[in-house]
Swiss-Prot record:
The active site is at C97 (nucleophile), C192 (cysteine persulfide intermediate). Residues 142-144 are annotated as: Interaction with tRNA. Its main location: cytoplasm. CDD domains: MnmA_TRMU-like. Residues 92-94 are annotated as: Interaction with target base in tRNA. HAMAP family: tRNA_thiouridyl_MnmA (MF_00144). GO terms for molecular function: ATP binding; tRNA binding; tRNA-uridine 2-sulfurtransferase activity. This is tRNA-specific 2-thiouridylase MnmA 2. It comes from Bacteroides fragilis (strain YCH46). It is found in: Cytoplasm. Belongs to the MnmA/TRMU family. InterPro entries: MnmA-like, MnmA-like_C, MnmA-like_central, MnmA-like_central_sf, Rossmann-like_a/b/a_fold, tRNA_2-thiouridylase_MnmA. The keyword Glycosyltransferase does not apply. Keywords: ATP-binding, Cytoplasm, Disulfide bond, Nucleotide-binding, RNA-binding, Transferase, tRNA processing, tRNA-binding.
Amino acid sequence: MDIAALLSGGVDSSVVVHLLCEQGYKPTLFYIKIGMDGAEYMDCSAEEDIELSTAIARRYGLALEVVDLHREYWDNVAAYAIEKIRKGQTPNPDVMCNKLIKFGCFEQQVGKDFDLTATGHYATTLQLGGKTWLGTAKDPIKDQTDFLAQIDYLQVSKLLFPIGGLMKHEVREIALRAGLPSARRKDSQGICFLGKINYNDFVRRFLGEKEGAVIEFETGKKIGTHRGYWFHTIGQRKGLGLGGGPWFVVKKDIQDNIIYVSHGYDAEQQYGYEFRMKDFNFITDNPWEGSTGEEEVTFKIRHTPEFIKGRLLHDEEGYRIISSEKLQGIAPGQFGVIYDAESRVCFGSGEIG
């Protein structure tokens, strides 16, 4: 079996290679190069990633190829993020990177020549009813199925997640025992294409700054200024520069560039328990095809370890969720990710409208 393994230079993908080799496979290794336009945004972490990936390849006597998808990334993902931010929405570039780049452009250019593509994602695949489904990871804190919830059946059927059945500390222990060069490397944080680049610097480069008012939601009183609504997201608490906190962003007026904040964030009053999703993507199949009733599900609206219980309803306008608990910071542009009631199978996701 021919396996392509995606390396990032981190401990997770390094352990993937180790486990595959232990099982007798000789995967071909690939490092996908993405990044920002402009020399001032060059990030030295990419060079370190390639060095560590090269060390892993040499360690196991495997071929490593660097695949440059910088232009494809910019055209498909970075531009998507900027457009969402411009509209006052909250993008999820990691979701789109997986869908369009790692398992999209890479598959079209390289992965098509292999039987499977192995990655260091914390996820699993399940065989149910003769079909492949995306399953959650053993480690609920590291589970990354919400970042994979826009892929399609062709993509999920070719994916292999060797560490999906392990806890993070077990992955570290394997790396330490094997003496892998990335064993003690810290996990990456933040948006996949930014590396060590500050998020606000990235937004500022493309959208600039424009001063606007910060207004207390309950009183209508101006309590400060901001440098552009695009720097702020619904539910944001940090980085507002206001005294007497905590303050939370509860509303944005895109037309007039106004940020509304609340001192005592009342999620129930602001949002209730319900949200709609548009353009819902079922990864494998719609398990409720033809059903007109309510379905008991669990879901996520952001990358957190917790799965929230709720009811999924379908009508002429699409799908909506009624949550079992009040929700904080529902952000248009993000994805509502739907799972079965036991949080074992990830069925897919839709953009929160």
